[in-house]
Every structure is written in C-alpha cells, then in structure tokens.
Amino acid sequence: MAIPSLKFYKESEYILSPEFGTTGSACFDIYSHFDDGHVPLWLDDKEARQARQTKRDSQGNIYVLIYPQERMLVPTGLTFDIPKDHSVRIHIRSSVALRDGLLLGNGEGVVDSDYVDPCYLILYNANNTARQIFNNTRYAQGELIKNYKYSLTEVKEAPGQKTEREGGFGSTDVKSEPSKGPSTGTSGLAI
C-alpha cells in the first residue's frame, strides 16, 4: 500500500515548512507566519473581524498581542493539497496549552480535501493576562487522516444499551464505592 503524500504550498520563501519533530511523531508541527503589519482578530463583543498591529521585541522578533478571552486568526502561510478521501486535523501543541494557556478556538481544526486556501490557526487566550504570539513559532500540529464514507440514518427509537455501562455522560469514571479523595481518572491529575 502506497503511503499518501500531503503536499503543501508556501506563500513565501520565508515561511517555515511543517515538519515532524521526531521519527515517532504522529503529527507534524505547524508554524505561525506573519510579517510586519496586521494579524486578523475576531472580537467576541463586536462579532467583527478586525486586525491588530504587529510589534517587535528587544531582539527584533515579530509578535502580536492576544488579550484575555480573545480569538485571533494566526496565519501559517501554508496551503495544503490534501489527497482525496483524506483531511488534515489541526491540534494545539500540548506544551502551548500547558505553558502558555493558549487553545484552539474550535477545539480541533478540520481541513477538508477540497479546501485550497491558506490555513489559519484560531488561537484563543484562556489566560487572565495578554500573551505574545510570535512569528515562526510552533503553536499547532497537524495530522493527515483517512476519511471513511458513511451514511446518516434517522431512527424512530432511541438506541438501546450495548454494553454493561450504566449512567450517562462521564459515567465510565464513576465507581460504586465511596470516594477516598479526588478522582484521578486515567491521567493521574486530580479533577
């Protein structure tokens, strides 16, 4: 079976190519790219697309500020040529979410094979303070996914139980024994 190839076009020679961080990486890193100028901004309160002027830090690095609870369209400068029956899924890098408190505004980006325009990252600042979004920085990661064709069928009765599961949303972490402290789920982090 041939390995599919994800082709990409860079809008300029200064755009950093997506790349796998290690030989075992499931996803490829995606870099931000913007020049001196403006970065698109979506303001929740006005529901209008505006732009914010870029700045330079003391080392000359280009950045733009994203304020608390704001969403910003961060350009990548990349257009993907996605194989038929595939899509690209875009995720925030875990270090960016943990260290910087930045998330993808749509949770997960989905780029369809028939979308042939430049890709943006919808960054959301979940912090109480402003953050700097730097040019040529790895904020997201992408993966090529095989799409499976399926139909949607309405049924007249609610689905019945298929396993021993009892309870609704989030019930797989609920035990019938009394709790002896905070639930740690499967990650080891207290919730």
Per-range role (PLM):
Residues M1-I191:
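DUTPase catalytic domain/fold
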